[in-house]
Amino acid sequence: MEKFRVIGSTQPLMGEVTISGAKNAALPILFASILAEEPVEVANVPHLRDIDTTMELLKRLGAKVERNGSVHVDPSSIDEYCAPYDLVKTMRASIWALGPLVARFGQGQVSLPGGCAIGARPVDLHITGLEQLGATITLEDGYVKAHVDGRLQGAHIVMDKVSVGATITIMCAATLAEGTTVLDNAAREPEIVDTAKFLNTLGAKISGAGTDTITIEGVERLGGGKHAVVADRIETGTFLVAAAVSGGKVVCHNTQAHLLEAVLAKLEEAGALVETGEDWISVDMTGRELKAVNIRTAPHPGFPTDMQAQFTLLNMMAKGGGVITETIFENRFMHVPELKRMGAKAEIEGNTVICGDVERLSAAQVMATDLRASASLVIAGCIAKGETIVDRIYHIDRGYDKIENKLNALGAKIERFRESN
C-alpha cells in the first residue's frame, strides 16, 4: 500500500500552481455522456482514480472511450446496462449511471455504491426522484434496478432535502423525459451548473441550474459536443489554505474566485491577503498573523463541507480559538484524532470541533480516513517538525491530481513510497 513521507519545514510554501478540473463535475459529466447518441469530447478532466474507474465502466457498458488530452466518449455503441459490483464498489458516484441508462434505454442497474465512509449518504433521494419520473425501481441482490416502458415522464419534484447527487441524477434523467420537469429545493453547486452546461451543449433544455429551482424541458435525443470541465474549487481552497498555514504566498491558476467566495471570505477573516483575477487567485500570508475563524458548513453558496478539514488545521495553527460546526455529514471529524497525534489541540463536541492553538505540530505516523481529510494531514506534515508518514493515501488519489508534485513545486518535501512487506 502506498504512503507519503513528508519532511516538515519552517519554510513557507511559495509559488504558483495550476488547478485541475473539478472531480465533482467531471464524474457526472462523464456519466451524463451515456445520454448522448453521438461522440462527446470532455476537456480539463483531472487524472484521478475515480475518473479511471468511470471510463472503464463506460467501456464495460459498450461505449468507446479514449484519452489523449481530452476524454473522448462515443456512447452510440452502448449495449450493456449494468454497472457491476467489481467496478463500482469503491466509488459512490457510480449511482449517476442509473438515471442516464433508464432515460435513454428504459433500463439500468447499478451495484450499491461505495466511496468515503463519512456518514449516511443514502441513494434514497436518487431512487425517489427516478420513481417520480415514472421509473420502477427494485433492490435485488445488492443492485438498484430501474425500468420504464417507453419514456420517462416530466414531473414537478420537490426534494425532501438538498442533495447534490440526487439533483444531478434527476436533472440528467429528465433531459430525455416526455414533458417538462420542475425540480424544487435543488442543490446549487457550481458542479451542477457545469453539468447542465454540458447537457445543454448536447441539445438539452435546462434552465435555472445554480438556483434552487431547475426546469428541464425534455427532448427526444441528445447529440454530440465539446465541453471543458469547471475548475476544482476544493483543490483551489486546499492550496490556498496550505499557503496560509505555512505563512507563504501561493497563486492558483486556471480557477475562478466566484466558485469559492465563502472560502475566500474566511481566509481574509483569518488574516490573509487575498487577490483575484479573471482566472487566478492568490493568498499572501507572509509577515501576517493567522487568526482563528468560526465556520458553519452549509450547502452552496455556504461554506463547503469539503473544506472543513483544511480549516480545522488552520484553526489549530492560528491565534485564538475557532469553532467549526459540521451540518452536512455526521462522522466527518475523523481527521481530528490524527492531527491530535501530531500535537494539535482540539475537542469534538457533537457536530462541532473546538480548536486551540499550538506553536508547531510534531511529526507522527497518521492515517488518511477520507478524501479531503487526507489533504489536511499532508499539509500538516509540511509544517510539522520531523518526518510524517501518511498511510492509506489511496483516499487522496481519489480526489487530488498529483498533490505531492504540486506541493513539492511550492517547496514541500513529499515522497510517495510503497512499504515492502
UniProtKB/Swiss-Prot annotation:
GO molecular function: UDP-N-acetylglucosamine 1-carboxyvinyltransferase activity
Residues modified as 2-(S-cysteinyl)pyruvic acid O-phosphothioketal: 116
UniProt KW keywords: Cell cycle, Cell division, Cell shape, Cell wall biogenesis/degradation, Cytoplasm, Peptidoglycan synthesis, Pyruvate, Transferase
Pathway, per record: Cell wall biogenesis; peptidoglycan biosynthesis
Catalytic activity: phosphoenolpyruvate + UDP-N-acetyl-alpha-D-glucosamine = UDP-N-acetyl-3-O-(1-carboxyvinyl)-alpha-D-glucosamine + phosphate
Residues bound to UDP-N-acetyl-alpha-D-glucosamine: 92, 121-125, 161-164, 306, 328
Family note: Belongs to the EPSP synthase family. MurA subfamily.
Task performed by this protein: Cell wall formation. Adds enolpyruvyl to UDP-N-acetylglucosamine.
NCBIfam families: murA (TIGR01072), PRK09369.1 (NF006873)
Protein name, as recorded: UDP-N-acetylglucosamine 1-carboxyvinyltransferase
